[in-house]
Amino acid sequence: MRFGLFGGTFNPVHLGHLRAALEVKEGFELEEIFLIPAALPPHKLPGEVVDAGDRLHMLNLALENTAGLSVSEVELQRSGPSYTIDTVNHFKSVLPEKSTIYLIIGLDAFLEIDSWKSYQALLLQVPIIVINRPQTDRGLSKLGWELMDDYLKSSLSGGYKFSELQSCYLAADRQPIHIFEVTALDISSTRIRSLVKKGRSIGYLVPRKTAKFIHSRGLYL
């Protein structure tokens, strides 16, 4: 069985997150993808994100009646910062023994993975799916695969080479690193927060129930 771990702040969750998750699920034939809100993201400053309970509730509303996508509270139940290596180890201990677990992250996040706690262990333990949206800010001058190629050679080393046959980067003693292009929806949590603060509509950027919750709670004002 194949499972995906898709972590993030989800501040708030939006249709870009959900569409990317669905496309990855179908593209890699995953049984289920767990969307995992971070309680205290190590790379975020206090006050930059709303309460974890609110972000969790928005995710639950967004995923109502969505087969194959579910919310995990594992990082919210952990004290201290949320580190991906700890989350991976948790799922390895609770999912069926022969499961393949994929770590799903955006291209921008992956290009900073060498700053993560125990990132070398991640590269050894789990295959990674790097989501690339065509025409993203960092993709204007170079295509996603070119950025990835430069980064792997300059920052991660390890002898990664791109396999045309398997459409991923391979290295001895490391798990594969896949680049997966998803539909380029021009939606970001930053933009949504800005629109809410300006009193403008966020319709069709987030699920309807999520938008209603944001307004009812007075979030991002």
Feature map (PLM): residue ranges:
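Nucleotidyltransferase catalytic core that binds NTPs
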Residues: 1-221
